[in-house]
UniProtKB/Swiss-Prot annotation:
Binds 1 Mg(2+) ion per subunit. It comes from Bordetella pertussis (strain Tohama I / ATCC BAA-589 / NCTC 13251). The keyword Magnesium applies. Its cofactor is Mg(2+). InterPro entries: HAD-like_hydrolase_sf (IPR050155), HAD-like_sf (IPR036412), HAD-SF_hydro_IA (IPR006439), HAD_sf (IPR023214), PGP-like_dom2 (IPR023198), Phosphonoacetald_hydro (IPR006323). This is Phosphonoacetaldehyde hydrolase. Pfam families: Hydrolase. GO terms for cellular component: cytosol. GO terms for biological process: DNA repair; organic phosphonate catabolic process. Mg(2+) binds at D19, A21, D193. The active site is at D19, K60. Its EC number is 3.11.1.1.
Length: 276
């Protein structure tokens, strides 16, 4: 690497791009999973919370399509309707899912412990705070209303239907780069609790941090998390790590409260000329 190239490398972070459910709000990412179960039940198809969590991180229509591609779920649908689920059937389930999600999402969107304090500290450092979500814009509006009441605010928000192609494609992360006026994607960190969300950051050229215990991968409520002893937490970490590694995160931590030491390490690596 020549001196001119080194001179153009960022020497400090410029921005973070956060996911929402399971990352900043909704410990355990329960709002979408429970509604997926209920939406499929309206069509006579029974799915488990574990099945509902499988494609988490995708846009919600894509998530339903992925669930319908599951052999066991598709078989139930065929028994009910005499055919495998088509894209039109996926849309019908999505149209049933959306109002149910709108009704319930704010109820689950309590900030994750440490998130508000973290964001306040990052702002004091002059970092820009972006975000994106697998939720469509209508649902995100409900999340943002609750977040604002709780004192949790970011500089920019992208919903899954704001871009032509959602996760794991990089469009939502890169929309943040453009709108926040970021000079170099290597100065950005993507923080997410799902493998597609981590992969989104990777494809966008960012540093990536996966969250082991606050989100979809572990699937623990805050009460369950707090009740675990260290052996229980380590077992949950192992389960989540196996899932999140599919997105190839640069770092894995328990929750956003553990992010500051990671950011310090990234800044050290940037100063040494490293890139994601």
């Amino acid at each position: 690497m020549n001196a001119m190239t080194l001179a153009t490398l960022p020497v400090r972070l410029e921005a973070l791009v956060f996911d929402w459910a399971g990352t900043l709000v909704d410990f355990g990412s329960f709002a979408p999973t429970k509604v997926f179960v209920d939406a499929f039940a309206r069509f006579g198809v029974q799915i488990s919370l574990e099945q509902a969590r499988g494609p988490m991180g995708m846009g919600k229509w894509d998530h339903i399509r992925a669930l319908c591609n599951d052999a066991a779920i598709a078989r139930q649908y065929q028994e009910q309707f005499g055919r495998l689920p088509t894209d039109e059937d996926v849309t019908a389930i999505y149209e049933r899912f959306l109002p149910m999600q709108l009704e319930k999402v704010a109820e689950y969107s309590q900030p994750i412990p440490g998130a508000i304090e973290l964001l306040h500290g990052l702002r004091q450092r002059g970092l820009k705070l972006g975000s994106c979500s697998g939720y469509p814009a209508a649902v995100m509006q409900r999340v943002l209303e609750r977040a604002e009441r709780e004192g949790l605010a970011l500089d920019y928000v992208v919903a899954s239907d704001d871009v032509p192609r959602s996760r794991p494609a990089p469009a939502m992360a890169l929309r943040n780069v453009v709108e926040l006026g970021i000079a170099d994607v290597a100065g950005c960190v993507k923080v997410d609790d799902t493998a597609p969300g981590v992969e989104e950051g990777r494809r966008a050229g960012m540093w990536t941090v996966g969250l082991l215990l606050s989100g979809n991968a572990a699937g623990l409520s805050l009460e369950q998390f707090l009740s675990l002893d260290e052996a229980g937490r380590e077992a949950a970490r192992d389960r989540a790590r196996a899932e999140l590694q599919a997105g190839a995160p640069h770092y894995l931590i328990d929750t956003v409260a553990d992010l500051p030491p990671v950011l310090a390490d990234i800044e050290t690596r940037l100063a040494a000329g490293q890139r994601p």
